[in-house]
């Protein structure tokens, strides 16, 4: 595993390393990509510190995989990798997204606004606790909120203009009573 801090500037979060599997250095990896089969084709992966990871073997299971990385030869070495986030460089991505697909990293920083143009805040992150993706919004008040990342709550994304439209009712930002303060 080489160390290269410069490589972190243009990264896309792709996976997280889980528990060891067996005694030969294999680990479970949760892949965040829509197509786990492509995981190995991305080539070299990087962690938060810029260390590189090269996949030697990979077996997929739904959105997870059992992976052996170069230089990880036993269970002890595999255990030391648990919890590491893996990134791929942007130029390594296969750019065949459909019109309604986005990389999460591209949405961070977009303005969040209502249909009428009122700016509510900006996208500052994503979460997924098992029931679907949630957008983390930093409201103009400084407060952070999680809203469902669905067509109902987020009916429109305008990447070129730098904003997305949110339906405040569907997103849970307002209750049933209109409150225009």
UniProtKB/Swiss-Prot annotation:
Record-linked Pfam families: PRC_RimM, RimM
Entry annotated with the keyword Ribonucleoprotein: no
UniProt subcellular location: Cytoplasm
Record keywords, A-Z: Chaperone, Cytoplasm, Ribosome biogenesis, rRNA processing
S-S bridge residues: none
GO BP terms: ribosomal small subunit biogenesis; rRNA processing
Family note: Belongs to the RimM family.
Purpose: An accessory protein needed during the final step in the assembly of 30S ribosomal subunit, possibly for assembly of the head region. Essential for efficient processing of 16S rRNA. May be needed both before and after RbfA during the maturation of 16S rRNA. It has affinity for free ribosomal 30S subunits but not for 70S ribosomes.
Subunit composition and interactions: Binds ribosomal protein uS19.
Protein name: Ribosome maturation factor RimM
Lineage of source species: Bacteria, Pseudomonadati, Pseudomonadota, Alphaproteobacteria, Hyphomicrobiales
């Amino acid at each position: 595993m080489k160390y290269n801090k410069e490589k972190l500037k243009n990264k896309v979060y792709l996976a997280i390393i889980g528990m060891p599997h067996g005694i030969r250095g294999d680990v479970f990896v949760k892949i965040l990509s829509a197509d786990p089969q492509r995981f190995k084709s991305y080539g070299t992966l990087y962690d938060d510190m810029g260390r590189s990871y090269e996949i030697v073997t990979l077996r997929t299971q739904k959105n997870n995989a059992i992976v052996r990385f170069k230089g990880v030869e036993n269970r002890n070495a595999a255990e030391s990798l648990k919890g590491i986030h893996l990134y791929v460089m942007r130029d390594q991505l296969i750019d065949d997204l459909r019109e309604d697909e986005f990389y999460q990293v591209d949405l961070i920083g977009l303005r969040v606004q209502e249909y009428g143009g009122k700016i509510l805040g900006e996208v500052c992150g994503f979460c997924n606790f098992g029931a679907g993706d949630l957008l983390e919004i930093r409201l103009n008040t400084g407060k952070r909120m999680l809203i469902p990342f669905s067509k109902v709550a987020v009916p429109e994304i305008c990447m070129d203009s730098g904003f997305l439209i949110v339906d405040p009712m569907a997103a849970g930002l307002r209750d049933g009573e209109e409150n225009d303060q």
